[in-house]
């Protein structure tokens, strides 16, 4: 009797194992069929599968692989999201995650463009404070520390590099660096962009129009020629009047012919 019960138990467990194997093989077969027959791809995708999403994006788009448990699902984007940078290849454009320490956004594998909150950006890296010889600006970037002089007086009012012959122009003033940065702070890949002269420009109005030097002689010559022309015109008008009066005083003799009978 015990042997019969044992045999029945073995048959039962073997049938259960066979059923589980059938279910697993059926699931694998359905998964293989779903990958072989491509479903309708999302926007911007050329080749895709139901299990892994997009496999190849259209040209000019980037593929981003998002992890979902043990799977990686591909999606197509026009630009990589924050924390990733784009790599363009002939076969496919990919979004690669930034791996620079304390970096939120990067331009390439070795250059960070935005650090985490409270940190300062310097030459593509993130620091808790700016290096010696540098100071922070309004965008949390370390720039060359540079002291500038006071503003110079406003320059003359000019237009097209001239100080005459106009009514309105521009004038400028500058302030220069008080000292040149040391080589230790100005050498390297990044230029000393913070230590440069500053220039301000404003509109100006000339109270009295100043003629240029050449314009005075030209104006005098023009006035002389105009006076000569006026004198010549007056003489010509006087001669014409005399000739008209002479013509009026001269009488032409008339000849009268009569008949004698």
Swiss-Prot record:
Query: Do you know which CDD domains this protein is assigned to?
Result: FU
A GO cellular component annotation here is: cytosol
Q: List the disulfide bonds.
A: 41-48, 45-54, 57-76, 80-95, 98-106, 103-112, 115-126, 130-142, 146-195, 157-164, 204-212
Q: Name one GO molecular function term.
A: signaling receptor binding
This chain's function reads: Activator of the canonical Wnt signaling pathway by acting as a ligand for lgr4-6 receptors. Upon binding to lgr4-6 (lgr4, lgr5 or lgr6), lgr4-6 associate with phosphorylated lrp6 and frizzled receptors that are activated by extracellular Wnt receptors, triggering the canonical Wnt signaling pathway to increase expression of target genes. Acts both in the canonical Wnt/beta-catenin-dependent pathway and in non-canonical Wnt signaling pathway.
Domains: entry comment? The FU repeats are required for activation and stabilization of beta-catenin.
Protein's name according to its UniProt entry: R-spondin-1
């Amino acid at each position: 009797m015990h042997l019969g019960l044992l045999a029945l138990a073995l048959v039962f467990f073997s049938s259960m194992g066979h059923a589980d194997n059938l279910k697993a093989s059926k699931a694998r077969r359905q998964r293989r069929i779903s990958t072989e027959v491509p479903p309708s791809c999302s926007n911007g995708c050329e080749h895709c599968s139901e299990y892994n999403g997009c496999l190849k994006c259209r040209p000019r788009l980037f593929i981003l692989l998002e992890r979902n448990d043990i799977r990686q699902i591909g999606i197509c984007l026009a630009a990589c999201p924050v924390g990733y940078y784009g790599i363009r290849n002939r076969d496919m454009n990919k979004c690669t995650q930034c791996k620079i320490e304390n970096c939120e956004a990067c331009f390439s594998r070795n250059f960070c463009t935005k650090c985490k909150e409270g940190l300062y950006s310097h030459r593509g890296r993130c620091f808790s404070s700016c290096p010696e010889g540098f100071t922070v600006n309004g965008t949390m970037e370390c720039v060359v520390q540079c002291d500038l002089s006071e503003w110079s007086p406003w320059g003359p009012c000019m237009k097209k590099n001239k100080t005459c012959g106009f009514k309105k122009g521009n004038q400028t003033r500058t302030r220069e660096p008080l000292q040149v940065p040391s080589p230790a702070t100005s050498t390297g890949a990044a230029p000393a962009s913070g230590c440069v002269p500053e220039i301000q420009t404003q509109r100006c109005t000339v109270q009295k129009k100043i003629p240029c030097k050449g314009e005075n002689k030209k104006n005098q010559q023009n006035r002389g020629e105009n006076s000569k022309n006026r004198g010549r015109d007056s003489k010509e008008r006087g001669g014409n009047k005399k000739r008209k009066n002479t013509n009026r005083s001269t009488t032409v003799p008339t000849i009268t012919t009569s008949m004698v009978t």
